[in-house]
Amino acid sequence: MSDAPVSSSAANAMWGGRFAAGPDAIMQAINASIGFDKRLYAQDIRGSRAHAAMLAAQGILSSRDAEAIGEGLLTVLSEIEAGGFPFRVGLEDIHMNVEARLKELIGEPAGRLHTARSRNDQVAVDFRLWVRDQCDAAITGIEALMQAFVAQAEAGADWVMPGFTHLQTAQPVTWGHHMLAYVEMLARDRSRFADARARMNECPLGAAALAGTGFPIDRHMTAAALGFDRPTANSLDSVSDRDFALEFLSASAICALHLSRFAEELVIWSSAQFRFVRLSDRWTTGSSIMPQKKNPDAAELLRAKLGRVLGAAVALFTVMKGLPLTYSKDMQEDKEQVFDAADTLMLGLAAMTGMVADMQANRESLAAAAASGFSTATDLADWLVRELDLPFRDAHHVTGTLVARAEARGCDLPDLTLAEMQEVHPGIREDVFAVLGVANSVRSRTSYGGTAPDNVRAQAARWKELLGGTA
């Protein structure tokens, strides 16, 4: 594809009736959006074909002209997809580039296509169609990643690992339970994209510049042709609304945040200090000077790249926050933010899916880490409540005292003798040691949503079924 220049006179042909001179070159550079909005070509052509068909059905356009327009637009589509379409900066945007080429192909009927339409409602429908398609793509990408996490959860339903708070060992959990935590996050992400898609599925085409049109158009016809549930109900809102883009960016930002959190965990877990996971060679790189290195570059790059999605959301909120109704040229700055966020998110989902599918948990390191750091202290406190009828606060104090003694001895809680424990509370019995093992600890967490292996297996099976059984 090329971005060919165009003369000022040609540039004015679309809107220049009241202008005596063409735009300054710098103005043209500021004004042109074809460098990025050419990505909307398929949606623009689809919207124009639906509009032409409706105009013909309403008797506003002859069937002969409508047929010529429809065939001409398909030719333009083929030219763009073949890679040889001469995009021209002077024609400003994708709408004018398509229309100008259509005029070259079919002549005078091309000028009738814009009847009862403005670029304001044209770009609104193009952009909505594109974002709607991206919601579908995001949902598909999220589901693939969910399946990868479910497969890990299914395999490691009873692999014990430490659960953390403040990045310090807190309580034993299972590998599968940790994997399913991300499935839950991603399920909410999927729901947010689905909700956003449902809300944006109204068609602004036919709102014209801002006030509607006096032509007897059928907005329900174009809405149905483009797969929308209904036409938008207020022409002012139709052309000034970018909530659909903001919602897409908001959902993308939260999803990116979730991906970034797991990327951070992969960086930590794959380090020599943790050795919780082995990352595939496909997702790591080496060092040019240190032969022993295997760097988690994919995870690190995602951790950084995904910040762009959050930045894009803030940028578009900033653009929109001070705009009066209806359309302002500021709104041309909406697309680059959405395009970049969508590209980054889709790359992140694909890369993370590959890393999760390929990673191997180091069960020995996980189990050893789970058994350290007094991870079953809460189990001891619970035992004191259940078996000795201590108030939990008293049990907490007794357990804390025992932890301090073990720490002073340089050992863990199971390494204390019964006599040492009875010095702190004489009611402690031999059977207390059963609750201090990490395997028993996770098996005991049978409350709904808890980390017990049977719970994990049940949840993994549930998600596998919900996701189509392909996990």
From Swiss-Prot:
Q: Reaction catalysed by this chain?
A: 2-(N(omega)-L-arginino)succinate = fumarate + L-arginine
**Gene Ontology CC terms:** cytosol
Q: Which family does it belong to?
A: Belongs to the lyase 1 family. Argininosuccinate lyase subfamily.
**Known SUPFAM superfamilies for this protein?**
L-aspartase-like (SSF48557)
Q: What is its EC number?
A: 4.3.2.1
**PROSITE patterns named in the record:** FUMARATE_LYASES
Keyword Endoplasmic reticulum attached: no
Official protein name in the record: Argininosuccinate lyase
Q: In which pathway does it act?
A: Amino-acid biosynthesis; L-arginine biosynthesis; L-arginine from L-ornithine and carbamoyl phosphate: step 3/3
